[in-house]
């Protein structure tokens, strides 16, 4: 459903941001 799609997008975004932060450290 829509909620599942939003949850998946949020996880992808969080993972992407975490990767960016780790690369800067």
Swiss-Prot record:
Function: Antimicrobial peptide with activity against Gram-negative bacteria but without activity against Gram-positive bacteria. Shows a low activity in stimulating insulin release from rat BRIN-BD11 beta cells, and acts without loss of integrity of the plasma membrane. Has very low hemolytic activity. Shows weak amphipathicity in its alpha-helical conformation.
Modified-residue entries (Leucine amide), positions: 25
Keyword flag Secreted: yes
Alphabetical UniProt keywords: Amidation, Amphibian defense peptide, Antibiotic, Antimicrobial, Immunity, Innate immunity, Secreted
Organism: Leptodactylus laticeps (Santa Fe frog)
Family label: Belongs to the frog skin active peptide (FSAP) family. Ocellatin subfamily.
Keyword match Lipid metabolism: no
UniProt tissue specificity: Expressed by the skin glands.
Cell compartment(s), UniProt: Secreted
Gene Ontology, cellular component aspect: extracellular region
Family annotation (InterPro entries): Antimicrobial15
Protein name listed in UniProt: Ocellatin-L1
Pfam family, one: Antimicrobial15
GO annotation (BP), single: innate immune response
Location (main, coarse): secreted
């Amino acid at each position: 459903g829509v909620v599942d799609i939003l949850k998946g997008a949020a996880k992808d975004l969080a993972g992407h941001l975490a990767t960016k932060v780790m690369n800067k450290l």
